């Protein structure tokens, strides 16, 4: 990975992986990539293989109790985590350690907001049958899942988490207001979007969006967002529509 300048106290992501060459990947493109080049955020891939044992740098072993696959060894992972921890706060609120795992809690926008408000993050990319539970417990790792599907490793999931998080860092997006009107920012899916031409193959832009009446446009967008959320994500709608408890 190419070294980039880093502004003082820039938000930093440390990624423990067997495939450091896969980073920054898509994060090196577009706005997140430009922000990385400018030093608005920093990325430090950590090669787990360098902490392996023996001539072949072994990082895994067979599961205790039998079964298929291999498990990442706790001693190997601990050495990588100790290196990653250098210069970082001990408080997990200031610097979460996140293990990308299919059994973790679902990753949500509020998690991205929480991570972005921290000083940085350490992401652990699993492989094979995962990581020894003892090191997960000992280091207070937070387990996050990016969807109900099993991947071959955590690298793609890590890039997803970083993309959602780094775009919330001040200065990364050209227009900070755009983050306030996106899907999930207020618990709803985003309303439909349109642009020129006004008539495309007989399909026209809803007249209210061309009316110039900002109040009516806002009402239309809110109604559309609510309807889409009810139809496509009833699980989100239940949370939004739930009456607030009086303080």
Swiss-Prot record:
EC assignment: 2.1.1.228
Subunit structure: Homodimer.
Stated family: Belongs to the RNA methyltransferase TrmD family.
Single GO MF descriptor: tRNA (guanine(37)-N1)-methyltransferase activity
Protein's name according to its UniProt entry: tRNA (guanine-N(1)-)-methyltransferase
Gene Ontology CC entries for this record: cytosol
Keyword Cytoplasm: yes
Gene that this polypeptide is encoded by: trmD
Residues reported to bind S-adenosyl-L-methionine: 126
UniProt-listed NCBIfam families: PRK00026.1 (NF000648), trmD (TIGR00088)
Catalyses which reaction(s): guanosine(37) in tRNA + S-adenosyl-L-methionine = N(1)-methylguanosine(37) in tRNA + S-adenosyl-L-homocysteine + H(+)
Annotated function: Specifically methylates guanosine-37 in various tRNAs.
Pfam family, one: tRNA_m1G_MT
The organism's taxonomic lineage, starting at the top: Bacteria, Pseudomonadati, Pseudomonadota, Alphaproteobacteria, Rhodobacterales
Main location (coarse class): cytoplasm
UniProt keyword terms in alphabetical order: Cytoplasm, Methyltransferase, S-adenosyl-L-methionine, Transferase, tRNA processing
One GO biological process term: tRNA N1-guanine methylation
Organism: Jannaschia sp. (strain CCS1)
Domain of life: Bacteria
Coiled-coil region(s): none
Subcellular location: Cytoplasm
